[in-house]
UniProtKB/Swiss-Prot annotation:
It is an enzyme of class 4 (lyase). The keyword Membrane does not apply. Binds 1 [4Fe-4S] cluster per subunit. The cluster is coordinated with 3 cysteines and an exchangeable S-adenosyl-L-methionine. Its cofactor is [4Fe-4S] cluster. It comes from the Bacteria. This is Phosphomethylpyrimidine synthase. It comes from Campylobacter jejuni subsp. jejuni serotype O:2 (strain ATCC 700819 / NCTC 11168). It holds the Pfam family ThiC_Rad_SAM. Belongs to the ThiC family. Homodimer.
Length: 430
Protein backbone atom coordinates (compact mmCIF):
# COMPACT_ATOMS: atom_id res chain seq x y z
CA UNK A 1 0.00 0.00 0.00
CA UNK A 2 1.28 3.48 -0.88
CA UNK A 3 0.78 6.36 1.51
CA UNK A 4 0.32 10.06 0.81
CA UNK A 5 4.03 10.44 1.61
CA UNK A 6 5.02 7.67 -0.80
CA UNK A 7 2.96 9.23 -3.56
CA UNK A 8 4.52 12.64 -2.91
CA UNK A 9 8.02 11.15 -3.10
CA UNK A 10 7.09 9.79 -6.53
CA UNK A 11 5.67 13.14 -7.63
CA UNK A 12 2.10 11.81 -7.78
CA UNK A 13 -0.48 14.48 -6.88
CA UNK A 14 -3.32 12.59 -5.20
CA UNK A 15 -6.98 13.55 -4.94
CA UNK A 16 -6.42 14.38 -1.27
CA UNK A 17 -3.49 16.64 -2.13
CA UNK A 18 -5.58 18.44 -4.74
CA UNK A 19 -8.28 19.18 -2.15
CA UNK A 20 -5.74 20.49 0.36
CA UNK A 21 -4.00 22.63 -2.26
CA UNK A 22 -7.31 24.24 -3.16
CA UNK A 23 -8.30 24.85 0.48
CA UNK A 24 -4.95 26.37 1.39
CA UNK A 25 -4.31 28.14 -1.94
CA UNK A 26 -0.97 26.37 -2.35
CA UNK A 27 0.90 25.20 -5.43
CA UNK A 28 1.23 21.56 -6.42
CA UNK A 29 5.03 21.71 -6.18
CA UNK A 30 4.99 23.25 -2.69
CA UNK A 31 2.66 20.57 -1.38
CA UNK A 32 4.48 17.65 -3.00
CA UNK A 33 7.86 18.83 -1.72
CA UNK A 34 6.71 19.28 1.88
CA UNK A 35 4.67 16.09 2.09
CA UNK A 36 7.61 14.14 0.68
CA UNK A 37 9.97 15.46 3.37
CA UNK A 38 7.45 15.11 6.23
CA UNK A 39 6.77 18.78 6.95
CA UNK A 40 3.14 18.46 5.83
CA UNK A 41 0.82 15.53 6.46
CA UNK A 42 -2.63 14.63 5.13
CA UNK A 43 -4.09 12.02 7.51
CA UNK A 44 -6.37 9.94 5.29
CA UNK A 45 -7.01 6.28 6.07
CA UNK A 46 -8.01 4.41 2.91
CA UNK A 47 -11.11 3.13 4.75
CA UNK A 48 -12.39 6.56 5.84
CA UNK A 49 -14.74 7.15 2.91
CA UNK A 50 -16.56 10.20 4.35
CA UNK A 51 -13.33 12.15 4.95
CA UNK A 52 -12.94 15.72 3.72
CA UNK A 53 -9.11 15.82 3.74
CA UNK A 54 -7.10 18.53 5.47
CA UNK A 55 -3.38 19.13 5.67
CA UNK A 56 -1.38 19.82 8.82
CA UNK A 57 2.03 21.43 8.84
CA UNK A 58 4.38 23.98 7.33
CA UNK A 59 2.77 26.90 5.50
CA UNK A 60 -0.78 25.72 6.31
CA UNK A 61 -3.43 27.16 8.60
CA UNK A 62 -3.32 25.91 12.19
CA UNK A 63 -5.83 23.11 12.61
CA UNK A 64 -7.97 22.30 15.67
CA UNK A 65 -8.76 18.92 17.21
CA UNK A 66 -11.76 18.14 19.41
CA UNK A 67 -11.60 15.30 21.95
CA UNK A 68 -14.69 13.32 22.86
CA UNK A 69 -15.66 9.83 24.00
CA UNK A 70 -17.18 8.01 26.95
CA UNK A 71 -15.78 7.06 30.35
CA UNK A 72 -16.97 4.54 32.92
CA UNK A 73 -18.82 7.35 34.75
CA UNK A 74 -20.48 8.80 31.64
CA UNK A 75 -21.60 6.30 29.01
CA UNK A 76 -23.84 8.30 26.68
CA UNK A 77 -22.89 7.79 23.05
CA UNK A 78 -25.81 9.92 21.82
CA UNK A 79 -24.37 12.95 23.60
CA UNK A 80 -20.95 12.25 22.11
CA UNK A 81 -22.50 12.23 18.63
CA UNK A 82 -24.03 15.64 19.38
CA UNK A 83 -20.48 16.81 20.11
CA UNK A 84 -19.46 15.48 16.69
CA UNK A 85 -22.26 17.52 15.09
CA UNK A 86 -21.08 20.61 16.98
CA UNK A 87 -17.51 20.06 15.81
CA UNK A 88 -18.72 19.79 12.21
CA UNK A 89 -20.78 22.96 12.62
CA UNK A 90 -17.65 24.91 13.55
CA UNK A 91 -15.55 23.38 10.79
CA UNK A 92 -13.24 21.43 13.09
CA UNK A 93 -10.63 19.50 11.12
CA UNK A 94 -9.89 16.64 13.56
CA UNK A 95 -11.85 14.63 16.12
CA UNK A 96 -10.31 12.17 18.56
CA UNK A 97 -12.34 9.40 20.15
CA UNK A 98 -10.83 9.00 23.61
CA UNK A 99 -13.40 6.49 24.87
CA UNK A 100 -11.81 4.44 27.61
CA UNK A 101 -14.61 2.20 28.81
CA UNK A 102 -16.28 -0.92 27.46
CA UNK A 103 -16.60 -2.01 23.85
CA UNK A 104 -15.92 1.12 21.82
CA UNK A 105 -15.84 -0.26 18.27
CA UNK A 106 -19.49 0.44 17.45
CA UNK A 107 -19.16 4.13 18.31
CA UNK A 108 -15.83 4.37 16.49
CA UNK A 109 -17.31 2.76 13.38
CA UNK A 110 -20.22 5.21 13.43
CA UNK A 111 -17.80 8.10 13.89
CA UNK A 112 -15.72 7.05 10.89
CA UNK A 113 -18.89 6.54 8.86
CA UNK A 114 -20.37 10.01 9.48
CA UNK A 115 -17.40 12.28 10.13
CA UNK A 116 -15.88 14.39 7.39
CA UNK A 117 -13.20 15.43 9.92
CA UNK A 118 -10.11 13.26 10.29
CA UNK A 119 -10.49 10.76 13.13
CA UNK A 120 -7.87 9.93 15.72
CA UNK A 121 -7.75 7.39 18.54
CA UNK A 122 -5.46 6.21 21.32
CA UNK A 123 -5.48 2.41 20.97
CA UNK A 124 -4.00 1.79 24.42
CA UNK A 125 -7.19 3.27 25.96
CA UNK A 126 -9.15 0.52 24.28
CA UNK A 127 -6.85 -2.35 25.22
CA UNK A 128 -8.58 -3.54 28.40
CA UNK A 129 -12.10 -3.31 26.96
CA UNK A 130 -11.23 -4.79 23.56
CA UNK A 131 -9.11 -7.64 24.89
CA UNK A 132 -11.23 -8.32 27.98
CA UNK A 133 -8.07 -8.70 30.03
CA UNK A 134 -6.72 -6.78 32.98
CA UNK A 135 -3.61 -4.72 32.27
CA UNK A 136 -1.15 -7.18 33.76
CA UNK A 137 -2.56 -10.03 31.65
CA UNK A 138 -2.04 -8.18 28.36
CA UNK A 139 1.06 -9.18 26.40
CA UNK A 140 3.08 -7.02 24.05
CA UNK A 141 1.54 -8.33 20.83
CA UNK A 142 -1.97 -7.81 22.25
CA UNK A 143 -1.43 -4.06 22.03
CA UNK A 144 -0.64 -4.40 18.34
CA UNK A 145 -3.90 -6.32 17.79
CA UNK A 146 -5.79 -3.30 19.10
CA UNK A 147 -3.83 -1.00 16.79
CA UNK A 148 -4.67 -3.25 13.84
CA UNK A 149 -8.41 -3.17 14.54
CA UNK A 150 -8.38 0.63 14.91
CA UNK A 151 -6.47 0.99 11.65
CA UNK A 152 -8.79 -1.36 9.79
CA UNK A 153 -11.84 0.53 11.10
CA UNK A 154 -10.69 3.66 9.24
CA UNK A 155 -9.11 5.99 11.80
CA UNK A 156 -6.78 8.49 10.14
CA UNK A 157 -4.25 8.97 12.92
CA UNK A 158 -3.36 7.24 16.17
CA UNK A 159 -1.64 8.49 19.27
CA UNK A 160 1.10 5.96 19.99
CA UNK A 161 3.28 6.51 23.05
CA UNK A 162 6.34 4.73 21.65
CA UNK A 163 8.84 7.26 23.01
CA UNK A 164 8.58 6.29 26.66
CA UNK A 165 11.04 3.44 26.30
CA UNK A 166 13.35 2.11 29.01
CA UNK A 167 15.84 4.96 28.44
CA UNK A 168 13.21 7.68 28.80
CA UNK A 169 11.63 5.86 31.76
CA UNK A 170 15.01 5.79 33.51
CA UNK A 171 15.37 9.56 33.12
CA UNK A 172 11.80 10.06 34.34
CA UNK A 173 12.57 8.08 37.51
CA UNK A 174 15.42 10.48 38.26
CA UNK A 175 13.31 13.58 37.71
CA UNK A 176 11.71 15.37 40.62
CA UNK A 177 8.34 16.14 39.13
CA UNK A 178 5.35 17.53 40.93
CA UNK A 179 2.86 15.74 38.71
CA UNK A 180 4.73 12.62 37.52
CA UNK A 181 3.11 11.25 34.32
CA UNK A 182 -0.20 12.92 33.40
CA UNK A 183 -0.72 11.25 30.03
CA UNK A 184 -3.37 8.55 30.45
CA UNK A 185 -1.87 6.36 27.74
CA UNK A 186 1.62 7.07 28.98
CA UNK A 187 0.76 6.18 32.57
CA UNK A 188 -0.86 2.90 31.48
CA UNK A 189 2.18 1.92 29.41
CA UNK A 190 4.60 2.91 32.16
CA UNK A 191 2.61 0.85 34.68
CA UNK A 192 2.61 -2.11 32.27
CA UNK A 193 6.38 -1.80 31.77
CA UNK A 194 6.99 -1.71 35.52
CA UNK A 195 4.66 -4.62 36.32
CA UNK A 196 6.04 -6.79 33.52
CA UNK A 197 9.65 -5.58 33.80
CA UNK A 198 9.54 -5.19 30.02
CA UNK A 199 10.24 -2.70 27.25
CA UNK A 200 7.46 -0.50 25.89
CA UNK A 201 5.71 -2.81 23.38
CA UNK A 202 5.18 0.01 20.87
CA UNK A 203 8.91 0.73 20.94
CA UNK A 204 10.00 -2.92 20.92
CA UNK A 205 7.69 -3.82 18.03
CA UNK A 206 7.82 -0.48 16.26
CA UNK A 207 8.50 -2.07 12.87
CA UNK A 208 5.36 -4.21 13.22
CA UNK A 209 3.45 -1.06 14.12
CA UNK A 210 4.76 0.64 10.98
CA UNK A 211 3.58 -2.30 8.86
CA UNK A 212 0.03 -1.80 10.15
CA UNK A 213 0.13 1.95 9.48
CA UNK A 214 1.52 1.34 6.00
CA UNK A 215 -1.32 -1.03 5.09
CA UNK A 216 -4.05 1.56 5.76
CA UNK A 217 -2.08 4.82 5.43
CA UNK A 218 -2.54 5.67 9.10
CA UNK A 219 -0.66 8.73 10.30
CA UNK A 220 1.37 8.24 13.46
CA UNK A 221 0.75 10.86 16.11
CA UNK A 222 3.72 10.14 18.34
CA UNK A 223 2.43 10.75 21.85
CA UNK A 224 4.28 12.60 24.57
CA UNK A 225 3.79 10.33 27.56
CA UNK A 226 6.18 12.54 29.53
CA UNK A 227 4.56 15.86 28.68
CA UNK A 228 4.54 18.27 31.61
CA UNK A 229 1.34 18.26 33.64
CA UNK A 230 2.35 21.37 35.54
CA UNK A 231 4.33 24.48 34.75
CA UNK A 232 6.87 23.27 37.33
CA UNK A 233 7.68 20.19 35.23
CA UNK A 234 7.91 21.91 31.84
CA UNK A 235 11.07 21.61 29.74
CA UNK A 236 12.64 19.10 32.14
CA UNK A 237 14.94 16.23 31.28
CA UNK A 238 12.15 13.67 31.09
CA UNK A 239 10.18 15.71 28.54
CA UNK A 240 13.21 16.44 26.38
CA UNK A 241 14.59 12.89 26.54
CA UNK A 242 11.30 11.56 25.20
CA UNK A 243 11.28 14.19 22.45
CA UNK A 244 14.70 12.96 21.34
CA UNK A 245 13.34 9.40 21.21
CA UNK A 246 10.38 10.64 19.16
CA UNK A 247 12.73 12.31 16.69
CA UNK A 248 14.45 8.97 16.05
CA UNK A 249 11.13 7.17 15.68
CA UNK A 250 9.96 9.84 13.24
CA UNK A 251 12.86 9.15 10.90
CA UNK A 252 12.18 5.41 11.00
CA UNK A 253 8.57 6.03 9.99
CA UNK A 254 9.57 8.42 7.21
CA UNK A 255 12.01 5.84 5.84
CA UNK A 256 9.06 3.61 4.91
CA UNK A 257 6.75 6.46 3.90
CA UNK A 258 4.56 6.81 6.98
CA UNK A 259 3.34 10.28 7.88
CA UNK A 260 4.09 11.53 11.39
CA UNK A 261 3.15 14.34 13.70
CA UNK A 262 4.58 14.93 17.16
CA UNK A 263 2.45 15.60 20.21
CA UNK A 264 3.51 18.28 22.65
CA UNK A 265 2.79 19.91 25.99
CA UNK A 266 0.86 20.29 28.13
CA UNK A 267 1.42 22.84 30.91
CA UNK A 268 4.12 25.43 30.28
CA UNK A 269 4.94 28.99 31.34
CA UNK A 270 4.32 31.41 28.50
CA UNK A 271 7.99 32.38 28.22
CA UNK A 272 9.01 28.77 27.47
CA UNK A 273 6.58 28.08 24.63
CA UNK A 274 8.47 29.55 21.68
CA UNK A 275 11.70 27.73 22.55
CA UNK A 276 9.82 24.43 22.86
CA UNK A 277 8.21 24.89 19.45
CA UNK A 278 11.61 25.60 17.90
CA UNK A 279 13.20 22.63 19.66
CA UNK A 280 10.61 20.20 18.29
CA UNK A 281 11.03 21.56 14.78
CA UNK A 282 14.82 21.25 15.03
CA UNK A 283 14.97 17.77 16.57
CA UNK A 284 12.16 16.29 14.47
CA UNK A 285 13.25 17.94 11.21
CA UNK A 286 10.10 19.97 10.73
CA UNK A 287 7.53 17.27 11.51
CA UNK A 288 4.15 18.85 12.32
CA UNK A 289 3.66 19.67 16.00
CA UNK A 290 0.30 18.96 17.68
CA UNK A 291 -0.01 20.55 21.13
CA UNK A 292 -2.49 20.37 24.00
CA UNK A 293 -2.82 24.02 24.96
CA UNK A 294 -0.24 24.59 26.32
CA UNK A 295 -1.88 25.77 29.53
CA UNK A 296 0.12 28.74 30.78
CA UNK A 297 -1.01 28.52 34.40
CA UNK A 298 -2.09 25.69 36.69
CA UNK A 299 -4.73 27.61 38.68
CA UNK A 300 -7.34 28.24 35.98
CA UNK A 301 -9.70 25.40 36.97
CA UNK A 302 -13.08 26.07 35.40
CA UNK A 303 -11.45 28.44 32.91
CA UNK A 304 -8.72 26.25 31.46
CA UNK A 305 -10.02 26.94 27.95
CA UNK A 306 -8.70 30.48 28.49
CA UNK A 307 -5.34 29.26 29.84
CA UNK A 308 -5.11 26.90 26.88
CA UNK A 309 -6.07 29.55 24.33
CA UNK A 310 -3.39 31.92 25.59
CA UNK A 311 -0.74 29.22 25.27
CA UNK A 312 -2.20 27.94 22.02
CA UNK A 313 -1.98 31.35 20.36
CA UNK A 314 1.68 31.69 21.31
CA UNK A 315 2.38 28.11 20.23
CA UNK A 316 0.65 28.54 16.86
CA UNK A 317 2.47 31.81 16.20
CA UNK A 318 5.74 30.04 17.05
CA UNK A 319 5.22 27.07 14.75
CA UNK A 320 2.67 24.65 16.25
CA UNK A 321 0.56 23.12 13.48
CA UNK A 322 -2.48 21.76 15.30
CA UNK A 323 -4.05 22.68 18.63
CA UNK A 324 -5.99 20.23 20.74
CA UNK A 325 -8.91 22.09 22.23
CA UNK A 326 -9.22 22.57 25.98
CA UNK A 327 -12.64 23.02 27.57
CA UNK A 328 -13.73 24.73 30.82
CA UNK A 329 -14.22 21.21 32.23
CA UNK A 330 -10.53 20.28 31.86
CA UNK A 331 -9.20 18.64 35.06
CA UNK A 332 -12.74 18.57 36.51
CA UNK A 333 -15.13 16.31 34.59
CA UNK A 334 -16.23 15.01 31.21
CA UNK A 335 -17.25 18.09 29.21
CA UNK A 336 -20.88 18.69 28.28
CA UNK A 337 -22.08 20.25 25.03
CA UNK A 338 -21.70 23.83 26.25
CA UNK A 339 -18.17 23.08 27.50
CA UNK A 340 -17.33 21.65 24.07
CA UNK A 341 -18.68 24.74 22.32
CA UNK A 342 -16.66 27.10 24.53
CA UNK A 343 -13.54 24.99 24.07
CA UNK A 344 -13.94 24.92 20.30
CA UNK A 345 -14.42 28.68 20.00
CA UNK A 346 -11.54 29.53 22.36
CA UNK A 347 -9.18 27.22 20.48
CA UNK A 348 -10.28 28.44 17.05
CA UNK A 349 -9.57 31.99 18.20
CA UNK A 350 -6.12 30.90 19.40
CA UNK A 351 -5.38 29.11 16.12
CA UNK A 352 -6.44 32.10 14.05
CA UNK A 353 -4.46 34.50 16.24
CA UNK A 354 -1.37 32.37 15.62
CA UNK A 355 -2.07 32.25 11.90
CA UNK A 356 -2.20 36.04 11.65
CA UNK A 357 1.37 36.06 12.97
CA UNK A 358 2.81 33.33 10.71
CA UNK A 359 0.56 33.55 7.63
CA UNK A 360 -0.10 37.21 6.74
CA UNK A 361 -2.82 36.27 4.22
CA UNK A 362 -4.96 35.04 7.12
CA UNK A 363 -5.52 38.67 8.21
CA UNK A 364 -8.00 39.18 5.35
CA UNK A 365 -11.03 38.03 7.38
CA UNK A 366 -10.07 40.38 10.21
CA UNK A 367 -9.85 43.26 7.75
CA UNK A 368 -13.32 42.39 6.46
CA UNK A 369 -14.62 42.41 10.04
CA UNK A 370 -13.03 45.80 10.68
CA UNK A 371 -14.63 47.17 7.52
CA UNK A 372 -18.02 45.79 8.59
CA UNK A 373 -17.62 47.49 11.97
CA UNK A 374 -16.69 50.77 10.33
CA UNK A 375 -19.79 50.48 8.14
CA UNK A 376 -21.88 49.28 11.12
CA UNK A 377 -23.03 46.28 9.09
CA UNK A 378 -24.29 43.98 11.83
CA UNK A 379 -25.24 41.02 9.64
CA UNK A 380 -21.83 40.98 8.02
CA UNK A 381 -20.19 41.12 11.46
CA UNK A 382 -22.21 38.11 12.61
CA UNK A 383 -21.28 36.24 9.43
CA UNK A 384 -17.54 36.89 9.87
CA UNK A 385 -17.36 36.13 13.60
CA UNK A 386 -15.99 32.73 14.67
CA UNK A 387 -19.19 32.23 16.67
CA UNK A 388 -21.63 34.47 14.83
CA UNK A 389 -24.61 32.76 16.45
CA UNK A 390 -23.53 33.89 19.91
CA UNK A 391 -22.57 37.35 18.65
CA UNK A 392 -26.05 37.85 17.18
CA UNK A 393 -27.75 36.51 20.31
CA UNK A 394 -25.81 38.91 22.54
CA UNK A 395 -26.56 41.87 20.25
CA UNK A 396 -30.28 41.11 20.24
CA UNK A 397 -30.46 40.65 24.02
CA UNK A 398 -30.03 44.43 24.36
CA UNK A 399 -30.91 45.53 20.86
CA UNK A 400 -30.57 49.32 20.41
CA UNK A 401 -33.33 51.54 19.04
CA UNK A 402 -30.85 52.97 16.53
CA UNK A 403 -29.04 50.23 14.60
CA UNK A 404 -26.22 52.65 13.80
CA UNK A 405 -24.84 51.79 17.24
CA UNK A 406 -25.07 49.13 19.93
CA UNK A 407 -26.47 49.38 23.45
CA UNK A 408 -22.97 49.97 24.84
CA UNK A 409 -22.28 53.34 23.22
CA UNK A 410 -25.66 54.51 21.94
CA UNK A 411 -25.41 57.93 20.33
CA UNK A 412 -21.74 58.14 21.33
CA UNK A 413 -20.79 55.33 18.93
CA UNK A 414 -17.33 56.29 17.69
CA UNK A 415 -17.85 54.60 14.32
CA UNK A 416 -21.10 56.46 13.67
CA UNK A 417 -19.64 59.77 14.87
CA UNK A 418 -16.69 59.50 12.50
CA UNK A 419 -18.83 58.30 9.59
CA UNK A 420 -21.01 61.39 9.98
CA UNK A 421 -18.29 63.97 10.52
CA UNK A 422 -16.13 62.67 7.67
CA UNK A 423 -19.14 62.98 5.35
CA UNK A 424 -19.48 66.62 6.40
CA UNK A 425 -22.56 66.03 8.53
CA UNK A 426 -23.19 67.53 11.95
CA UNK A 427 -23.02 65.19 14.95
CA UNK A 428 -25.83 65.39 17.47
CA UNK A 429 -25.60 63.63 20.83
CA UNK A 430 -28.84 65.02 22.20
Amino acid sequence: MKTQMNYAKEGIFTKEMQIVAQKENLSKDFLLENIACGKIIIPANINHKSLDPNGIGFGLRTKVNVNLGVSNDCVDYSEEMKKVELAHKFGIEAIMDLSNYGKTSRFRDELVNVSKAMIGTVPVYDAVGFLEKDLKQINAKDFLDVVYHHAKSGVDFMTIHAGINSRAAHIFKQSKRLTNIVSRGGSVLYAWMMMKDAENPFFEYYDDLLDICLKYDVTLSLGDALRPGSTHDASDGAQISELIELSLLTQRAWDVGIQVMIEGPGHMAINEIEANMQLEKRLCKGAPFYVLGPLVTDIGAGYDHISGAIGGAVAAASGADMLCYVTPAEHLRLPNLEDVREGIVATKIAAHAGDIAKLPKERARDDEMSKARQEIDWEKMFKLAIDGEKAKKMFNERRPDDLNSCSMCGKMCAMNTMNQILKGEDVSLA
